[in-house]
Amino acid sequence: MNIIQQYEAREIERLSGVRAVPEFIAGDTVRVGVRVVEGTRERVQSFEGVVIARSNKGLNSNFTVRKISNGEGVERVFPLYAPSIASIEVVRRGKVRRAKLYYLRGRSGKSARIAERPRDLPKADSMAAS
């Protein structure tokens, strides 16, 4: 591991201690709390939508969230470890078979829906032990 990788690993560990980053993948619906500064006041604005892409590049990891606002598609790219992100909450888990869901850009209505992933069931050996 070179010096840059060591530095990035330390920073990721430090930033993960400040704010927990939940496990999520493309297809999941997330609510991202973004810190917005208006004059002297600071407030948290939420942005809720479907994760259509996730790029894992260490400290430079980011994810793209898409939502429909007033009939218009809005996409926003968030750096995963940005200090402007107050919180990331997974609202629901989607079942998809792709890593990038760019095809949702051309769809609207029912064709843009994503099926919900069933909850993880307990394993059979843990059931037998009970």
From Swiss-Prot:
Cross-referenced InterPro entries: Ribosomal_bL19, Ribosomal_bL19_CS, Ribosomal_bL19_sf, Translation_prot_SH3-like_sf
Molecular function in Gene Ontology: structural constituent of ribosome
Pfam families the UniProt entry points to: Ribosomal_L19
Record flagged with keyword Ribosomal protein: yes
Tagged with keyword Flavoprotein: no
Keywords from the UniProt entry: Ribonucleoprotein, Ribosomal protein
A biological process term (GO) from this entry: translation
Gene Ontology CC, one term: cytosolic large ribosomal subunit
Domain of life from the UniProt record: Bacteria
Biological role: This protein is located at the 30S-50S ribosomal subunit interface and may play a role in the structure and function of the aminoacyl-tRNA binding site.
Annotated family: Belongs to the bacterial ribosomal protein bL19 family.
PANTHER family: LARGE RIBOSOMAL SUBUNIT PROTEIN BL19M, RIBOSOMAL PROTEIN L19
Official protein name in the record: Large ribosomal subunit protein bL19
